[in-house]
A protein has these predicted regions:
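Terminal amphipathic helices with adjacent charged low-complexity linkers/tails
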Residues: 61-65, 288, 352-356, 366
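A short glycine-rich beta-alpha junction/loop motif
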Residues: 179, 195-203, 234-254, 469-472, ...
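Non-catalytic DNA-recognition/assembly elements of restriction-modification systems
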Residues: 10, 17, 22-34, 41-43, ...
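Short, ligand-facing micro-motifs at secondary-structure edges
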Residues: 120-122, 141-155, 175-198, 212-218, ...
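Proline-centric
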Residues: 1-9, 32-34, 47-48, 99-108, ...
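Hydrophobic alpha-helical scaffolding
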Residues: 4, 30-34, 60, 99-103, ...
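Sequence-specific dsDNA recognition surfaces
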Residues: 91-96, 111-126, 140-172, 192, ...
Length: 589
């Protein structure tokens, strides 16, 4: 089977094998990794280095003849004093050869194909604001990826000329290799390049025998190369590629004609991968836009009938609409928005209206002030018509967080002296989440705080809401029953609602699009930050108390369905990943 046929016959597997990244990237599908296409690119390069990508021509001069000429040229350069005689590299044993090569190919150590070295030391005091660019590993990685780099380190032309006397300055068709960080990343030196490089951080392959540099470059981007250099790279937690290790890496060396044919075929197939990748990304973007547009018809519905009609339209295509994690996340956000708009459950005219609830809350707070349990709050202005984003159902009211809160507070800066190996839980931003109010318990810290003062003020109780107020503002954590003694740090706000509001409507509101929009509004300082007064001023739709419970139950029911959908989707995605892996293994073996 040709590689072209391998691509076209299984295009559904290559394009549908997706993986969710842990961190968001650029664009609406920045969190999606096109795993299948990535595996296809790896496969193309792996087939190439094994000599299985293009058929061999028995009339081609074998690689052994080319290697003889290279050895003769090297001996002549030593004789002329242009290069130093190298210590012979170890013979290649049969046990070392990782796979069988086609007839006419040879295994060779990289050091036998050219000269591998590093630069002369450039001291920090020699760095200049302009002059000849001075590249470290990070600049080589950027050059390899984009073909250009915005560099901020330079050396003087005079120093550059003196450093070039050692014969290891970059020249056209030499190959730079990163020695630290992401090791082994190659960059072919172009005719217009003029730069120097950091010793040990970057290695240079001096192409003294005019080997086809594009062929070596393809090998240096293959999985085979990455596996080989990491197998014996120095360092435990940090890998490095040394000159001695690079010298000894085995290279599958093709005949000159095969090298040219392979590079051409790889470029041709990578272009197909580029097209497939662009089509997949465009399809994912179009799908997500369609989902978001249709879901917007639900929140934009003007009445119950229109909402029902729009839902019927979506439900008829449920199995084709909600097929990605992003689309399911959008559905979750729509459910939460419908909930706070009063469109998720029907209103009951027999419910006590929210206006009466607010009166009761006001009376309860007045009593707590009288008993000295809370301080009297400064009254905030009512929610203005300009702030109200939509019309509320009958029986609902607009209010601010401060109207239903006993108090808000944040932790202090000097809690480091209370840190301990065990004791009370210290809730930090690392325990909060963006779209969930369940506390994260995978990154726990402990404190032994004072009994009075800060210890009393920042001690958490069940149903307290903890909110991040610096950096990634608006991340949440709801304190559950049975958590035990716990406190907050200075980057979080403790929001304690009046006991009558201890239900799940309010945590659901705090993770809704309406709340997130308010968290994203104030931008203060170098990092986004939120003051306690900003939290108190958050405006929200307040349903009757009985309806709050019905809404929370319905949200929980629907979000459980969404979680089940996502779980099924992830299982299906895992199957597609296994199929892509199996297809790759089958093609290689």
């Amino acid at each position: 089977m040709t590689v072209e046929k391998l691509i076209t016959d299984h295009i559904d597997i290559w394009s549908s094998a997706l993986q969710t990244r842990s961190a968001a990237g650029r664009g609406s599908n920045g969190k999606i990794d096109l795993y299948g296409i990535k595996k296809l690119r790896e496969l193309i390069l792996e087939l190439a280095v094994r000599g299985k990508l293009v058929p061999q021509d028995p009339n081609d001069e074998p690689a052994s003849e080319l290697l003889k000429r290279i050895a003769a040229e090297k001996a002549e350069l030593v004789k002329q004093g242009k290069i130093k005689k190298q210590k012979p590299l170890p013979e290649i044993s049969e046990d070392e050869k990782p796979f069988e090569l086609p007839v006419g190919w040879e295994w060779v150590r990289l050091g036998d194909l050219g000269l591998i070295g590093s630069s002369s030391r450039v001291h920090q005091q020699d760095w200049k604001p302009d002059g000849i660019p001075f590249y470290r590993a990070r600049e080589i990685v950027t050059l390899a990826k984009y073909g250009e780099v915005n560099n901020d380190l330079f050396i003087s032309p005079e120093l550059f000329e003196s450093l070039c006397l050692n014969g290891l300055s970059p020249e056209t068709n030499d190959i730079m290799l990163t020695g630290v960080g992401t090791i082994g990343v190659p960059y072919i030196v172009k005719p217009y390049d003029k730069f120097y490089f950091k010793d040990a951080s970057v290695l240079i392959f001096k192409n003294t025998h005019a080997i086809y540099s594009e062929y070596l470059n393809k090998i240096f981007t293959s999985k085979y190369w990455k596996d080989e250099i990491h197998k014996y790279s120095m360092g435990t937690t940090v890998h490095t590629l040394t000159i001695s290790r690079a010298n000894e890496v085995l290279i599958p060396f093709a005949s000159e004609q095969d090298q040219i044919g392979l590079v051409s075929k790889i470029d041709e197939l990578m272009l197909l991968c580029d097209q497939l990748e662009q089509q997949s990304l465009s399809s994912l973007d179009a799908h997500q836009q369609l989902v978001e547009t249709l879901l917007a018809t639900l929140t934009d519905s003007q009445n119950t009938k229109e909402l029902s009609d729009n839902w019927v339209r979506i439900s008829q295509h449920f199995d084709t609409l909600f097929t990605t994690e992003a689309s399911i996340d959008a559905l979750k956000q729509t459910i939460l928005q419908l909930a706070v708009m009063g469109k998720l459950v029907p209103q009951d005219p027999n419910d006590e209206p929210a206006s009466e609830l607010l009166k009761r809350i006001e009376q309860e707070k007045a009593q707590l002030v009288k008993e000295g349990k809370i301080k009297k709050q400064k009254p905030l202005p009512p929610v203005s018509d300009e702030e109200k984003p939509f019309e509320l159902p009958v029986g609902w009211e607009w209010c601010r967080i401060s109207d239903i809160a006993m108090f808000t507070t944040s932790g202090s800066r000097d809690w480091a002296k209370y840190y301990s190996e065990k004791g009370a839980l210290f809730v930090t931003m690392g325990n909060l989440s963006k779209y969930s109010y369940d506390l994260r318990m995978d990154n726990l810290r402990y404190v032994t705080p004072p009994v009075e003062g800060e210890g009393l003020r920042t001690k958490l109780e069940p149903f307290d809401l903890v909110i991040s107020i610096t950096g990634d503002v608006g991340n949440l954590g709801l304190i559950p029953e049975g958590l035990g003694e716990a406190y907050i740090n200075q980057h979080t706000c403790l929001l304690r609602l009046i006991p009558i509001c201890h239900n799940y409507y309010f945590p659901e509101f705090m993770r809704s699009p309406m709340a997130k929009l308010q968290f994203n509004t104030p931008q203060r300082g170098i990092k986004n930050s939120f003051r306690l007064s900003d939290v108190e001023e958050i405006y929200l739709p307040l349903p009757p108390l009985e309806e709050q419970h019905r809404i929370a139950d319905k949200v929980n029911e629907y979000l459980l369905i969404c979680s089940h959908l996502k779980s099924c989707l992830q299982s299906a995605q895992q199957t597609r990943l296994h199929l892509a892996d199996a297809l790759t293994d089958a093609a290689l073996n």
